[in-house]
Amino acid sequence: MSFSAVILAAGKGTRMYSNVPKVLHTLAGKPMAKHVIDTCSDLGASHIHLVYGHGGDTMQQVLADEPVSWILQAEQLGTGHAVNQASSGLADNEKVLILYGDVPLISGDTLTNLLDAQPDGGIALLTVVLDNPVGYGRIVRRNGPVVAIVEQKDASEEQKLIKEINTGVMVANGGDLKRWLGQLKNENSQGEYYLTDIIAIAHDEGRAVEAVHPVNPIEVEGVNNRIQLARLERAYQAMQAERLLEQGVMLRDPSRFDLRGKLQCGTDVEIDVNVIIEGNVSIGNNVLIGTGCVLKDCEIDDNSVIRPYSVIEGATVGEDCTVGPFTRLRPGAELVGDSHVGNFVEMKKSRLGRGSKANHLTYLGDADIGDRVNIGAGTITCNYDGVNKFKTEIGDDVFVGSDTQLIAPVKIGKGATIGAGATINRDIGEGELVITRAPARTIKGWKRPVKQK
């Protein structure tokens, strides 16, 4: 179906007590407005118009890559006025979906139902029934059909008893919407142009108004303060955790798991508590993720174990690998397979070959390490001279002793052995043994100092 979307995002968000525009506050690591934009894009919106006001420069910087038309609402004169700012860009013969940048959990399924439910020439609007509707506009029906929406401040005592409320989300044809917007008046307690008044205008024209309920009521909850944002964050994470559990992923405690991107898992994946997933993460079969790990834009292949408190970003972990605890794999790190990096090891733009291991206290940067290599504790690839980065190449079956500095650019040939405490600043041939430390000396008769009285 062809439709365009208008997203209202001009509010200041006073109750957030922040210099950040309200719709840029993040939920699951993504600005609230982007959640709504992505949902519209996934549904195939032909155009997305974003109506902004406060913090416009910041919004355009943060959302610079989004497929939206920017519509300025210089004065905040109500929701009807906000939509009217975008009217010149709305096609007469296209459905127009009106959404809100601070209602981030609205789903594609709910919006599809709403678009499908729109009567010919009429309006479809999203409503919910609340036990406590205080503060919301009430849905006024007459013998069944919706005839009007009355805002809380303008409602009579009888109307305040109504429990069906307006969410603000609606769809109408572009031509009709523009005509109705032109008839709005600001004769109300707020002195604003209410978008909701078009319901009564449409009814007076004999147009049908259809009310639709969301798939899940949490979808239409908005955010005005940090308490509400935190509540939606937990609701979102609970939904993501439930989906993963249904797919066979074992989350040891679903309430202590955060998904801030997309996660693809194989079978028999186990994720311990307080794990954070960001960006696009792919996990193979029979993988264990330990407590406190952070995974971002990475791939972990079958039968690998990520031990607690490891951080993996932009890296690839091959099959049958062990990582951690307390390992950091930075962008460009690759463990080929059956390899091991242990506690306090950091890798960046480096490849660790099959069967190789760096078990302790090591930095590997811009390094290409072959198969079956042992990297001793305290080894550092010195890849940076203050201006440029240089590469370290280590062949297969090399043994690097503890506390070794490899000053790049440098090559270590296959089967070479480097003794502990070495500083290597030249290439080492295949099979060579290199020892750079001075011989140990013994001082006979030496005595420790005695504290003077």
Curated annotation (Swiss-Prot):
Region (Pyrophosphorylase): 1-226
CC annotations in GO: cytoplasm; membrane
Main location: cytoplasm
Protein name: Bifunctional protein GlmU
GO molecular function terms listed in the Swiss-Prot or TrEMBL record: glucosamine-1-phosphate N-acetyltransferase activity; magnesium ion binding; UDP-N-acetylglucosamine diphosphorylase activity
Region annotated Linker, chain positions: 227-247
The reaction(s) this protein catalyses: alpha-D-glucosamine 1-phosphate + acetyl-CoA = N-acetyl-alpha-D-glucosamine 1-phosphate + CoA + H(+); N-acetyl-alpha-D-glucosamine 1-phosphate + UTP + H(+) = UDP-N-acetyl-alpha-D-glucosamine + diphosphate
Signal peptide feature range: none
Compartments reported by the entry: Cytoplasm
Stretches for region N-acetyltransferase: 248-453
Residues the record lists as binding UDP-N-acetyl-alpha-D-glucosamine: 8-11, 22, 73, 78-79, 100-102, 137, 151, 166, 224, 330, 348, 363, 374
Gene name tied to this protein: glmU
Pathway: Nucleotide-sugar biosynthesis; UDP-N-acetyl-alpha-D-glucosamine biosynthesis; N-acetyl-alpha-D-glucosamine 1-phosphate from alpha-D-glucosamine 6-phosphate (route II): step 2/2; Nucleotide-sugar biosynthesis; UDP-N-acetyl-alpha-D-glucosamine biosynthesis; UDP-N-acetyl-alpha-D-glucosamine from N-acetyl-alpha-D-glucosamine 1-phosphate: step 1/1; Bacterial outer membrane biogenesis; LPS lipid A biosynthesis
Coiled-coil regions listed: none
Transmembrane segments: none
Swiss-Prot/TrEMBL GO biological process terms: cell morphogenesis; cell wall organization; lipid A biosynthetic process; peptidoglycan biosynthetic process; regulation of cell shape; UDP-N-acetylglucosamine biosynthetic process
Organism: Photobacterium profundum (strain SS9)
Cofactor binding annotation: Binds 1 Mg(2+) ion per subunit.
Record SUPFAM superfamilies: Nucleotide-diphospho-sugar transferases, Trimeric LpxA-like enzymes
